C-alpha cells in the first residue's frame, strides 16, 4: 500500500462534536433547559439520538456520525444545527455557539443528574461547577494505535495555531477578560488538561493510563482531557483544543484543517520523515500566546528560534498541508481559513460589537444570528 492509499483506505475519517449554549430568547441568559429540549417534543426525531446533555443543563452537545470526508461532515453539521435551532425556538430558546457566554453566572446553572457528572462534581467541587465552557472536538480516524500515538505526539506543535483560529471566548461573567480564549484558562483548572507530554509508544501511553486507574485517579481514560489524545474507545485521534466556533463554516474549515494536518503528518511518517517533536513546555508557551492574543499575536517558530506573526505562520501551515488537502479534496474548505485570517475570529467580532454598543445583550444577539448562518 502506498502512503497515499493509506490516507484513503477507510482512514482519516471525521467525527465532529459541537457544544452549544441554550439561551433564553428574552433575557439572553443561559437557561438550564437541555432535559426539556431533548425529552422528545415535536421535531426531536430529527436529531436521531445525536444530541446529548453535558454537565450543565444549559449545554447541549451534538455529534456527527463517522464521516468519510468533509462534505459529508458539513451536511451532517447543517442538519444537526438546524434541527437544534428549530427545537430550541419552539421552547422560546435560542442556540449560541461560542466558547463562553458573555455574562451568565455559572452559580445559577443546574447540574445534569447522572453518575458520571455526580462523580466529577464530588471530586472537583467548584472547579467542576465553574467549568461553564463550550468547545469543538474533532476526531480523525486512525486504525493503527502506534500510528495514532505518533500523530498525537507530532500534531501538538500545531495546536496553538488551530486554537488561535477558533478563539470565541473574550468575555467572562460580564467583563472583557483581556483574553481571546477565556475558555482555555478556565479549563486549565481541571486536572489532566492542556498540552500533553510525549509518549514513546502507545504501550507507554497505556501504561500511564493503567497507573492512573490502578491508583484511583481516574476510572477510565475519558477523564484525561488533554488538548489532543488517542481516544480510549474509538480508533481516532481527538483534537480538543478549539473554542466552540460560532459560524458553521468555521467549524467545517477547522475540521478540514485538523484532518489535513493529520494527513500530512501521516505522509511524512510513512516516508520516514516524521515531524520534529517539541517539548510540552515550549508548545505551552505558544498556547498561552494564542489564548491571550488570538490571531493578533506572535508565536515562536522553534526551528528559527524567533517570534513570527500568527497569520504568517497559519499561511505557512496551509502551504504545509496542501498535499494532503488535495488528496482529501478539502482545498475549498481550507480557503475559509484564509478568510478567518482576513476577517478575524468570533472573539474579534464579539469585541467589536461590544466596543460599538457597550451591550452584552447586543453581543448575544449577534452570536445568535451568526450561529445560524448557513443553515
From Swiss-Prot:
<dbReference type="Pfam" id="PF04107">
    <property type="entry name" value="GCS2"/>
</dbReference>
<comment type="function">
    <text>ATP-dependent carboxylate-amine ligase which exhibits weak glutamate--cysteine ligase activity.</text>
</comment>
<dbReference type="InterPro" id="IPR011793">
    <property type="entry name" value="YbdK"/>
</dbReference>
<keyword id="KW-0436">Ligase</keyword>
<dbReference type="GO" id="GO:0005524">
    <property type="term" value="F:ATP binding"/>
</dbReference>
<dbReference type="GO" id="GO:0004357">
    <property type="term" value="F:glutamate-cysteine ligase activity"/>
</dbReference>
<dbReference type="InterPro" id="IPR050141">
    <property type="entry name" value="GCL_type2/YbdK_subfam"/>
</dbReference>
<keyword id="KW-0067">ATP-binding</keyword>
<comment type="similarity">
    <text>Belongs to the glutamate--cysteine ligase type 2 family. YbdK subfamily.</text>
</comment>
<dbReference type="GO" id="GO:0042398">
    <property type="term" value="P:modified amino acid biosynthetic process"/>
</dbReference>
<dbReference type="InterPro" id="IPR006336">
    <property type="entry name" value="GCS2"/>
</dbReference>
<protein>
    <recommendedName>
        <fullName>Putative glutamate--cysteine ligase 2</fullName>
        <ecNumber>6.3.2.2</ecNumber>
    </recommendedName>
</protein>
<dbReference type="InterPro" id="IPR014746">
    <property type="entry name" value="Gln_synth/guanido_kin_cat_dom"/>
</dbReference>
<keyword id="KW-0547">Nucleotide-binding</keyword>
Amino acid at each position: 500500500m502506498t502512503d497515499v492509499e493509506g490516507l484513503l483506505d477507510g482512514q482519516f475519517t471525521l467525527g465532529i462534536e459541537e457544544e452549544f449554549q441554550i439561551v433564553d430568547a428574552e433575557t439572553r441568559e443561559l437557561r438550564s433547559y437541555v432535559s426539556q429540549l431533548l425529552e422528545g417534543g415535536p421535531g426531536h426525531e430529527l436529531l436521531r439520538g445525536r444530541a446529548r446533555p453535558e454537565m450543565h443543563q444549559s449545554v447541549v452537545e451534538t455529534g456527527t456520525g463517522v464521516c468519510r470526508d468533509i462534505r459529508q461532515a458539513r451536511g451532517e453539521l447543517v442538519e444537526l444545527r438546524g434541527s437544534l435551532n428549530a427545537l430550541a425556538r419552539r421552547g422560546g430558546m435560542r442556540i449560541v455557539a461560542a466558547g463562553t457566554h458573555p455574562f451568565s453566572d455559572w452559580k445559577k446553572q443546574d447540574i445534569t443528574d447522572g453518575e458520571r457528572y455526580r462523580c466529577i462534581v464530588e471530586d472537583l467541587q467548584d472547579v467542576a461547577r465553574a467549568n461553564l465552557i463550550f468547545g469543538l472536538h474533532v476526531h480523525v480516524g486512525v486504525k493503527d494505535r502506534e500510528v495514532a500515538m505518533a500523530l498525537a505526539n507530532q500534531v501538538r506543535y500545531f495546536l496553538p495555531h488551530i486554537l488561535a483560529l477558533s478563539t470565541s471566548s473574550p468575555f467572562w461573567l460580564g467583563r472583557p477578560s483581556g483574553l481571546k480564549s477565556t475558555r482555555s484558562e478556565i479549563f486549565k483548572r481541571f486536572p489532566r488538561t492542556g498540552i500533553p507530554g510525549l509518549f514513546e509508544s502507545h504501550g507507554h501511553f497505556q501504561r500511564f493510563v493503567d497507573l492512573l486507574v490502578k491508583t484511583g485517579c481516574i476510572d477510565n481514560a475519558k477523564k484525561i482531557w488533554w488538548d489532543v489524545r488517542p481516544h480510549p474507545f474509538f480508533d481516532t485521534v481527538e483534537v480538543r483544543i478549539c473554542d466552540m466556533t460560532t459560524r458553521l463554516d468555521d467549524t467545517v474549515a477547522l475540521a478540514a484543517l485538523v484532518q489535513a494536518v493529520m494527513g500530512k503528518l501521516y505522509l511524512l511518517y510513512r516516508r520516514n520523515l516524521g515531524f520534529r517533536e517539541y517539548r510540552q513546555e515550549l508548545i505551552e508557551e505558544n498556547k498561552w500566546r494564542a489564548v491571550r492574543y488570538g490571531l493578533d499575536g506572535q508565536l515562536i517558530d522553534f526551528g528559527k528560534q524567533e517570534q513570527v506573526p500568527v497569520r504568517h505562520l497559519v499561511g505557512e501551515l496551509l502551504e504545509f498541508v496542501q498535499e494532503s488537502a488535495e488528496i482529501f479534496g478539502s482545498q475549498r474548505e481550507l480557503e475559509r481559513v484564509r478568510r478567518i485570517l482576513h476577517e478575524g475570529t468570533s472573539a474579534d467580532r464579539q469585541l467589536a460589537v461590544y466596543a460599538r454598543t457597550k451591550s452584552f445583550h447586543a453581543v448575544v444577539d449577534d452570536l445568535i444570528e451568526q450561529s445560524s448562518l448557513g443553515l
